[in-house]
Regions:
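Active-site beta-loop-alpha junctions enriched in small/polar residues
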Residues: 40-42, 74, 107-110, 150-152, ...
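N-terminal pre-domain/capping segments
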Residues: 20-140, 160, 167, 177, ...
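A short, acidic, flexible beta-alpha connecting loop/helix-capping segment that sits on the rim
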Residues: 299-317
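Acidic/histidine-rich catalytic cores of soluble enzymes
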Residues: 30-32, 170-279, 283
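Active-site cleft segment of glycoside hydrolase catalytic domains centered on the general acid/base Glu
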Residues: 152-169, 175, 313
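Conserved beta-strand positions in the central sheet of alpha/beta enzyme cores
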Residues: 70, 104, 146, 184, ...
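Bacterial Sec-dependent N-terminal signal peptides
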Residues: 1-25
Length: 330
């Protein structure tokens, strides 16, 4: 009887998860621009970037005019180590006081970490970490955690690594379901980066609360054309609940070859610029989101060395440029 009741409770939570994050409706008229600022934008993670406390960031996001925020679930922002029950209650109240929506927590995981060293249950460790993030998310008043897949390690069969990602997502998804939380898998890490592979992965995971945080950045760097990116959005339509934007310029790199009195081409360095000033085609991408009736927020992040530097004033200018840019889609 106890087992039956537990199973029913888990099923109920899964049903709640399905409704917690709205999927694209297929109707363009249902699309609304809802803006979100990622706290990584003011977290001091790249050379010269200013650092704000969590409270300073919340005040900043409100003053700039964002509808919601995405909080990085690691130091120096919202780390599990630092946020006990009292701190969680205080932060939740502060977000409500400012009239902001906590769109999601940003988790930082890698399900293939340690795949080359047997004996350590790294996939379980990652899943437990994500489960704790789900509890943190619930305590703070959101029902979504952004997560990753895994980086591909050399000299380990790909399918072994892929299977760990599937296993990890299934374990993490079931833990997150206890708190009514959806996991949004971002197309960021190596495993299942391409949209066809990501769709296959999520189909295989087959949990109602494991969805996708699908961005324009990686398909562009994969070399997809605007039309192919549009079709990628359509492919991912059954899963997209979140997206994060950032724009970049390509800076070519060369090394001098003394023997040939010439230069050899190297991989380009990407540098962040205000949205609309780089090579990413966000008009095409956001219009594709509109066409599928996307229901989530459009987040903005400054997580790489930014043109103009990392001063508060320059970060603010770039954030405001994003808000101005997305007005055309309202």
């Amino acid at each position: 009887m106890v087992k039956r009741n537990l199973s029913l409770a888990i099923l109920l939570l899964n049903v709640l998860c399905i409704s917690a994050q709205k999927l694209p409706t297929g109707n363009p008229a249902d699309f609304k621009v809802k803006t979100c600022l990622h706290s990584v934008s003011y977290m001091g993670i790249w050379r010269g970037q200013a650092t704000l406390t969590v409270d300073e960031f919340l005040v900043k996001a409100k003053a700039l005019g964002f509808d919601g925020v995405m909080l990085a679930a690691k130091r120096p922002h919202v780390s599990l180590i630092d946020y006990d029950d009292a701190a969680r209650q205080k932060l939740r109240a502060r977000i409500k006081e400012l009239g902001l929506e906590l769109v999601c927590l940003a988790g930082y995981c890698d399900f293939t970490a340690g795949v080359d060293k047997a004996g350590i249950p790294n996939t379980e460790i990652q899943a437990i970490y994500i489960g704790e993030l789900a509890k943190l998310a619930k305590d703070l008043g959101t029902n979504m955690v952004r997560i990753y897949t895994g980086y591909e390690r050399p000299d380990v069969p790909y399918d072994k690594q892929y299977s760990l990602v599937v296993e990890g997502l299934q374990m993490a998804g079931k833990l997150a379901a206890r708190y009514g939380v959806t996991l949004a898998v971002q197309n960021h890490h190596d495993i299942a980066l391409h949209h066809d592979a990501m769709k296959w992965l999520l189909d295989e995971v087959n949990l109602p609360n494991v969805k996708a945080a699908f961005d324009c950045w990686s398909p562009t760097l994969e070399g997809l054309s605007p039309e192919e990116i549009k079709q990628a959005v359509y492919t991912m339509k059954p899963y997209i609940v979140h997206t994060t934007t950032a724009d970049y310029k390509e800076l070519p790199r060369y090394t001098y070859d003394l023997n040939h009195t010439n230069y050899s081409r190297k991989e380009s360095q990407m540098r962040a610029v205000p949205i609309g000033e780089g090579f990413l085609d966000y008009k095409n991408f956001i219009n594709a989101l509109r066409e599928i009736g996307y229901q989530g927020y459009i987040a903005y992040e400054m997580c790489e060395v930014l043109e103009g530097g990392g001063s508060i004033d320059n970060l603010d200018r770039s954030a405001l440029a994003f808000l101005e840019y997305v007005k055309q889609f309202r």
